[in-house]
Amino acid sequence: MKRTWQPNRRKRAKTHGFRARMKTKSGRKVLKRRRQKGRHRLTV
């Protein structure tokens, strides 16, 4: 059986990257929450 984690840097950034988060309203909410929480890394 194929494993679920097939590393791919490009896909990772395109799905969870900063610009991907900024594109949608909900993504911006994610960043807002993470800033509020004080995360050092907002995105991947």
Swiss-Prot record:
Which InterPro entries does the record match to this protein?
Answer: Ribosomal_bL34 (IPR000271), Ribosomal_bL34_CS (IPR020939)
> GO CC annotations?
ribonucleoprotein complex; ribosome
Q: Which GO terms describe its molecular function?
A: structural constituent of ribosome
The lineage is: Bacteria, Thermotogati, Deinococcota, Deinococci, Thermales
Which NCBIfam families does UniProt cross-reference here? rpmH_bact
Subunit arrangement?
Part of the 50S ribosomal subunit.
**What is this protein's record name?**
Large ribosomal subunit protein bL34
Q: Which Gene3D superfamilies does the record cross-reference, listed alphabetically?
A: 1.10.287.3980
Give a Pfam family name.
Ribosomal_L34
For this protein, the record's PROSITE patterns field holds: RIBOSOMAL_L34
**Which pairs are disulfide-linked?**
none
What family does the database annotate? Belongs to the bacterial ribosomal protein bL34 family.
The region called Disordered is annotated at 1-44
From what superkingdom does this record's organism come? Bacteria
Q: What biological-process terms (Gene Ontology) are attached?
A: translation
Any further remark recorded for this protein: The open reading frame (ORF) for this protein is entirely within the ORF for the RNase P protein (RnaP). The two start codons are separated by four nucleotides.
Keywords recorded for this protein, A-Z: Ribonucleoprotein, Ribosomal protein
Q: Does the keyword Ribonucleoprotein apply?
A: yes
PANTHER family from the xrefs? Answer: LARGE RIBOSOMAL SUBUNIT PROTEIN BL34M, MITOCHONDRIAL RIBOSOMAL PROTEIN 34 FAMILY MEMBER
